[in-house]
Amino acid sequence: MSVHIGAKPGEIAEHILLPGDPLRAKYIAETFLEGAVCYNEVRGMLGFTGTYKGHRISVQGTGMGVPSISIYVNELIQSYGVKTLIRVGTCGAIQPDVRVRDVILAMSASTDSNMNRLIFRGRDYAPTADFHLLRTAYDVGMEKGLALKVGNVFTADMFYNDEPNWETWARYGVLAVEMETAALYTLAAKFDCRALSVLTVSDHIITGEETTAEERQTTFNDMIEVALEAASRNDA
């Protein structure tokens, strides 16, 4: 056991999906994994391990934001030997050509979080996805005919921000805003692991367009399938 994960050694696979919502983890396990078994209920942050097309895969809720995902990623890697981590979550678009329900593969992540500034003593670090995971996920998306976008996302420390300045980030090509990817990529690099964020555009920050519950469910499935295929095809 680690501090926040109650799994025994060997109960967590080397390849894992990371939704923020623990109920989304439960949905993924019940819908996509065979023989899924719950290994964690600590703090209600559910975790499961099963198989996908014969490959052993885990799924673990992480909560929201940089501090929360950092706790789980640290423990998954250091205490349980996880090697491949794929975030599956939502984001808000800030580009006019990025549409609600599109799937974004986060090639890199800008951030206003101070975590990396503390680690690198005030200098800027560029959190970046694993190329092989990114390429595989892109190929899967093309095979499925999905509306994929690949590029930089912005990891925000605040969900409610009175002065977000999205226009500046959009002008520099940032596709969307979320709250975890920069931390995931930084920690994966630190521990020589592979990481990728596969994100569904659930709303458009500039236009105000949103998805319905039914539309979210369908699009989330596309995102989850891309992530599962990327994890299983990179199972070396």
Curated annotation (Swiss-Prot):
Q: Which GO terms describe its molecular function?
A: purine-nucleoside phosphorylase activity
What is this enzyme's catalytic activity, as reactions?
a purine D-ribonucleoside + phosphate = a purine nucleobase + alpha-D-ribose 1-phosphate; a purine 2'-deoxy-D-ribonucleoside + phosphate = a purine nucleobase + 2-deoxy-alpha-D-ribose 1-phosphate
Q: What InterPro entries does the entry give?
A: DeoD-type, Nucleoside_phosphorylase_CS, Nucleoside_phosphorylase_d, Nucleoside_phosphorylase_sf
In this protein, the active site sits at: 203
Its BP terms in the Gene Ontology are: purine nucleoside catabolic process
Name the positions where phosphate binds. Answer: 20, 24, 43, 87-90
Top-level EC class, please? Answer: transferase
* Keyword set, alphabetical order: Glycosyltransferase, Transferase
Site positions for Important for catalytic activity: 216
Per the UniProt entry, the Enzyme Commission number(s) are: 2.4.2.1
| Annotated binding of a purine D-ribonucleoside, by residue | 4, 178-180, 202-203
Gene Ontology cellular component list:
cytosol
In terms of Pfam families, this protein maps to: PNP_UDP_1
Stated family: Belongs to the PNP/UDP phosphorylase family.
Function, as annotated, reads: Catalyzes the reversible phosphorolytic breakdown of the N-glycosidic bond in the beta-(deoxy)ribonucleoside molecules, with the formation of the corresponding free purine bases and pentose-1-phosphate.
Which NCBIfam families does this chain map to? deoD, PRK05819.1, PRK13374.1
Complexes and interactors: Homohexamer; trimer of homodimers.
Q: What is this protein called?
A: Purine nucleoside phosphorylase DeoD-type
In its UniProt entry, the species of origin is given as: Geobacillus thermodenitrificans (strain NG80-2)
